[in-house]
């Protein structure tokens, strides 16, 4: 990372903490950090004294800006940009009469028009709810007469297109399911509507929640920070839409990192909950051993607020019984700016070393945690687990998709495929034709063949991994945390910057599927930006049902660093201010 950028980030992060800035400058000078930042200094004619001067100057500038930030903040305390406003801010505006749900929906629809249908054409939105404005008017009147149902009353939410909605198609991004209208809402969608949330849109995704970040229904999705970059998958449409402020809240699904990859790639916050905390009813399955819906938003506060609305025991999903007496209905109560003060954090260095700038940002994040009082220690996963985790995941994932997708297909119209074999047959026919209103996806459709040939749930290999491998992974990760009394293990959510849309760059060995193999929760918070202005996120992996603690830690980190920024491709539109 270029030295001025890194120094500015640190200066801004610690601008209101003079002692921490001084301490950090001395620490980095002692470590000769300018030598790492200017490795070619002698060739470029930059002396070490010049580098040191730049380092000090940029840090002092950051400190100056931080010290005067309270004055600026006081002047603008009553006005926020749309993307800056949390649910709490919006409810304050609702209560003061300066904002209505109808107006909020209009603001988001204008942004979708400007940046998804026109402009950079992010291609994140598949379907808009044509009743959204009318629903907003009804909810405004209800608020006036009887008050709000919940903090989500009148708040627009956008859903990944593999989550059932009875009033909009659910295709999982696939032409194989084009036009499918489910018989009812998914359990979590019903919970959202009952809380007064407005389902604004259905979002593009990696087809059938796997493969490249495109779908045969919607095509490729673009990253609002750089449209030549991928928003990652499979919840890429949700990640791009929330970063670009097409809705206040988004829902993705995560089987092997599909909430967390798009969260970090688009510079937002998100959560892969503990397996069983949220119902999977009405979600197109990929592998039920791993599948989990996850809230995504620009702010940790909003992620916490949305999660509490969706929890609860669902008789149609046996996994939710694990959350009995362990789920909360209000996670915002655990948001604590001082939560890092007594925390013990493990850094999984197994996932560093693949992108120097990502590593720099993670190291700066660790310093931020230490400055807030946290103790940070190194942890390492057993090498054998790192070696086998991919095979375990694929073995279970492919076989479960083959066995479980027919159960979902049985709930939709007779005109749709009813088995994986029928899906393969129809995909082959579509590829031989020129479909209207879609784009063939041979990469994902060829994977259907591999899934069909993968085996059954009776295979000894599957049984061994499911019944013995997964519990072993759980014991190992819990043991790592117990051995050092850790509150969370952190790591770069993606060890490299987002890949190009055409597939170049990105990749690397990721830790994300460890949270799926174990079923443990994983909270992602923005950590910074690379020199080419691409987002980097940091993951907080915790024990089962430790979401309250993770929210405290993540919120404290977010408030201490405040590195989130609006994507350059989707700037604010005129009149988007929220007046509280």
Model features per residue range: what roles?
Residues 57-70:
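Bacterial N-terminal signal peptides
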Residues 153-172, 334-348, 398-473, 478, ...:
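Short helix-loop capping/hinge segments that flank enzyme active sites or metal/cofactor-binding pockets
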Residues 114, 244-349, 363-372, 407-411, ...:
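Structural helix-boundary/capping segments
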Residues 97, 154, 194, 246, ...:
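Glycine-rich, small-residue loops and helix-cap segments
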Residues 152-293, 318-322, 346-348, 489-508:
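Short glycine/serine-rich loop/turn segments
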Residues 31-47:
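Short, Lys/Arg-enriched N-terminal segments with co-localized hydrophobic residues
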């Amino acid at each position: 990372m270029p030295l001025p950028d890194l120094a500015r980030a640190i200066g801004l992060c610690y601008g209101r903490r003079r002692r921490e800035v001084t301490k950090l400058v001395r620490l980095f000078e002692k470590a000769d950090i300018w030598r790492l930042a200017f490795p070619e200094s002698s060739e470029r004619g930059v002396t070490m004294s010049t580098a040191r001067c730049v380092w000090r100057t940029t840090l002092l500038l950051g400190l100056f800006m931080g010290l005067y930030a309270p004055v600026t903040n006081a002047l603008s305390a009553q006005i926020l940009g749309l993307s800056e406003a949390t649910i709490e801010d919006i409810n304050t505006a609702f209560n003061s009469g300066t904002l209505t749900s109808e107006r909020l929906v209009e603001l988001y629809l204008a942004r979708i028009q400007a940046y998804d249908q026109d402009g950079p054409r992010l291609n994140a939105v598949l379907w808009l709810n044509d009743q959204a404005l009318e629903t907003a008017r009804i909810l405004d009147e209800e608020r006036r007469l009887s008050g709000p149902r919940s903090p989500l009353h009148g708040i627009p939410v956008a859903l990944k297109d593999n989550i059932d909605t009875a009033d909009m198609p659910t295709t999982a991004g696939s032409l194989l399911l084009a036009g499918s209208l489910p018989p009812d809402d998914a359990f979590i969608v019903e919970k959202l509507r009952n809380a007064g949330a407005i389902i604004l849109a259905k979002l593009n995704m990696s087809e059938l929640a796997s493969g490249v970040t495109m779908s045969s229904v919607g095509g490729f999705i673009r990253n609002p920070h750089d449209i030549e970059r991928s928003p990652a998958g499979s919840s890429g449409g949700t990640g791009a839409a929330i970063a670009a402020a097409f809705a206040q809240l988004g829902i993705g699904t995560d089987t092997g990192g599909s909430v967390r990859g798009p969260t970090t790639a688009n510079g937002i916050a998100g959560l892969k909950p503990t397996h069983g905390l949220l119902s999977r009813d009405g979600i197109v399955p990929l592998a039920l051993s791993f599948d989990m819906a996850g809230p995504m938003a620009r702010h940790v506060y909003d992620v916490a607020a949305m999660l509490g609305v969706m929890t609860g025991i669902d008789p149609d999903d046996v996994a939710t019984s694990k959350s009995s007496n362990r789920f909360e209905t209000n996670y915002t109560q655990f948001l604590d700016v001082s939560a890092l003060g007594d925390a013990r954090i493990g850094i999984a260095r197994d996932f560093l070393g693949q992108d120097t700038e990502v590593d720099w940002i993670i190291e700066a994040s660790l310093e931020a945690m230490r400055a807030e009082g946290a103790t940070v220690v190194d942890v390492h996963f057993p090498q054998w687990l790192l070696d086998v985790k991919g095979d375990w995941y694929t073995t279970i994932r492919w076989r479960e998709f083959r066995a479980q997708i027919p159960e979902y297909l049985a709930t939709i119209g007779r005109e749709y495929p009813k088995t994986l074999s029928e899906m393969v047959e129809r995909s082959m026919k579509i590829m031989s034709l020129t479909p209207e209103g879609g784009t063939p996806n041979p990469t994902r459709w060829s994977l259907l063949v591999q899934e069909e040939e993968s085996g059954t749930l009776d295979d000894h290999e599957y049984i061994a991994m499911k019944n013995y491998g997964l519990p072993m992974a759980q014991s190992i990760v819990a043991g790592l945390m117990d051995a050092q009394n850790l509150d969370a293990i952190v790591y770069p959510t993606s060890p490299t910057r987002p890949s190009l849309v055409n597939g170049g760059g990105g990749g690397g060995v990721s830790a994300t599927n460890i949270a799926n193999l174990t079923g443990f929760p994983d909270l992602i918070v923005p950590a910074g930006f690379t020199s080419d202005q691409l987002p980097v996120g940091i993951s907080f992996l915790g024990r089962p049902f430790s979401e309250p603690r993770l929210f405290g830690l993540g919120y404290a980190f977010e408030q201490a660093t405040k590195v989130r920024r609006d994507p350059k491709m989707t700037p604010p539109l005129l009149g988007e201010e929220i007046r509280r």
